Amino acid sequence: MCTSGQIIGSLLVLSVLEIGLGVSSVAVGAVSFSLALREHKPQLGDSSPFLLCGICGILCAKKKSGLVMILFSACCICGLIGGILNFQFLRAVTKKTSSLYPLHLASMSLACIGIGGCTLSSWLTCRLASYEQRRMFSEREHSLHHSHEMAEKRLRAIEITDLPSCPVVPPTPELPTRK
């Protein structure tokens, strides 16, 4: 079973990979845009959702709060959808033209790697959330157990201090006299 530190480390590595993919995708998009302007050809898709996904992943690894984990999961899902749509768009464009094939292949490869990274990041986020949930339940259980122990000690202390200092012997009932 992975520890929280291992999960966070893996999440950081994947987030840096996603940022790299996002920057690379933006660069490929800029090159394709300049080529599209010169040749009047359709522009390639853009995988910049991976950039946003990577930034949210680093934030998630640092904060570890529930809200940030939900935000990161949403970004991963958006990255998955964006990557799949980008891949499908590029596949359709590649069939029509072959002059930009190396650029299309690079964009499709970035989209595939980004899809894989988003999938792994989503899985790791679920693992991290599960780990944090177990940790919180364990802390709550420990705290509850500790509060019960303290309550029992207080009750014993109250019982001891409420006793009179000298023992009181109950009176013995008198026996009836015989006639």
UniProtKB/Swiss-Prot annotation:
GO annotation (BP), single: negative regulation of cell migration
Record keywords, A-Z: Cytoplasm, Membrane, Transmembrane, Transmembrane helix, Tumor suppressor
Regions that span the bilayer: 11-31, 44-61, 67-87, 100-120
Recorded topology in the membrane: Multi-pass membrane protein
Source species, domain of life: Eukaryota
InterPro entries, alphabetized: TMEM196
Function text: Acts as a tumor suppressor in lung cancer. Inhibits tumor cell growth by inhibiting cell proliferation and migration and promoting cell apoptosis. Inhibits metastasis of lung cancer by suppressing beta-catenin expression in the Wnt/beta-catenin signaling pathway.
Designated name of the protein: Transmembrane protein 196
Species name: Pongo abelii (Sumatran orangutan)
Lineage: Eukaryota, Metazoa, Chordata, Craniata, Vertebrata
